[in-house]
């Protein structure tokens, strides 16, 4: 397909890591991660394979993305983005999700991601527990107060 069909957005921005990126709505991000993870396209499958076989090169050795891809043995592909964005795809299933923390921070997006992945059945109970211990911990200065919306596309 022509480039304009794949990438209808023309405004370029820079992510936190400096990589050029397009401004797009969350439903488009989720759709793109579903396509990325689907296995229907050889080029995208190669990207997913590279990400899941070497997750530490995606975001560093101790990052959420690396831990999710490593602990799920490559069944989930994950990439954190700037301003509270988190995109995740179920490898081989053609399913994707995108999360946006309204305040632009990481505080909630990882906890939301772990919760959604558990609810969707994308994580085993053991992996879910391990990720929850690290990313869903409340302290005396934190509370679980749900704010925002959840839309399924």
Report residues per predicted region.
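Single conserved hydrophobic/aromatic residue that forms the stacking wall/gate
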Residues: 1-11
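Sparse, context-dependent recognition of short Cys/His-centered cofactor- or disulfide-binding micro-motifs
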Residues: 7, 14, 72
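Short, contiguous, pocket-lining structural segments
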Residues: 14-25, 39, 43
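Hydrophobic (often cysteine-bearing) scaffold residues that line and stabilize catalytic clefts
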Residues: 4, 25, 109
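General structural signal for secondary-structure boundaries
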Residues: 7-8, 25, 124
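Structured C-terminal helix/loop/strand segments within mature extracytoplasmic catalytic/sensor domains
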Residues: 34-153
């Amino acid at each position: 397909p022509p480039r304009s069909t794949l990438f209808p957005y023309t405004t370029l921005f820079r992510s936190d890591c400096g990589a050029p990126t397009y401004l797009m709505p969350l439903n488009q991000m989720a759709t793109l991660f579903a396509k990325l993870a689907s296995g229907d396209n050889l080029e995208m499958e190669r990207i997913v394979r590279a990400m899941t076989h070497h997750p530490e090169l995606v975001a560093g050795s101790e990052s959420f993305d690396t831990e999710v891809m490593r602990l799920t043995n490559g069944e989930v592909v994950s990439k954190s983005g700037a301003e509270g964005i988190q995109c995740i795809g179920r490898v081989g299933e053609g399913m994707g999700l995108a999360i946006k923390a309204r305040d632009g921070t990481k505080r909630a997006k990882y906890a939301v991601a772990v919760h959604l992945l558990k609810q969707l059945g994308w994580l085993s109970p053991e992996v879910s527990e391990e990720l929850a211990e690290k990313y869903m911990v409340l302290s005396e200065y934190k509370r679980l107060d749900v704010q925002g919306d959840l839309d399924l596309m």
